[in-house]
Amino acid sequence: MTKRFVLILALKAFALFAVIIYAGIGLGPDEAQYWTWSRDLDWGYYSKPPGIAWQIWAGTALFGQTEWGVRSFTLFFSVFQAFAVYLLALRAGLFPRTAFWCGLFMAFSPLGLIGSLFAITDVGFLFCWTGACLTVVSALHQNKSADPLIVGGWILAGALFKWPIYLFWFFFLCFRHWFFP
């Protein structure tokens, strides 16, 4: 099941890579603004944290000042996001077949597809939220409390993309209080 899932994700990534390279889809207004930010890195911007600018800076440093450079890490994040959802479903105790479909639905959901094509802040934010959830569920699976430093690392990374990830602390603290008083 895992091999099939990885193959489908690889085919999705290859197809969307081809779309980014050959379809001639120019940068949208938000992407152009984020790209402008990436040329002058800072710790924050008037409406967003710096993660998207740093991500675009890294992509353009590796792949040049092209649409692919701007969008490359978004495609990587979205593929890893679908795989993280698959792992989360497995760790939560779902059957492998159900976990397969969970990951596939994430990969081909509107956010999974649009987030693969365009440099938006939601992809990095959601990847980090899922990583924090995976950390908590894995600890619960072992009948332990999740390490706050690891969860905090995921929250810190997610806060570089969108500030609402700070809400995860509330859920995490409730989880610790209810399951490990």
Where are these regions (language model features)?
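Extracytoplasmic catalytic/substrate-binding loops of multi-pass membrane glycan-assembly enzymes
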Residues: 22-34, 44-55, 64-68
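Transmembrane-helix signature of polytopic, membrane-embedded enzymes
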Residues: 85-108, 126-127
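Membrane-interface transmembrane helices that cradle and orient dolichyl/undecaprenyl
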Residues: 90-93, 132-149
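Short acidic/glycine- and proline-prone juxtamembrane loop motifs at membrane-interface regions
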Residues: 111-125
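Transmembrane-embedded, aromatic-rich helix segments that form part
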Residues: 149-153, 164-179
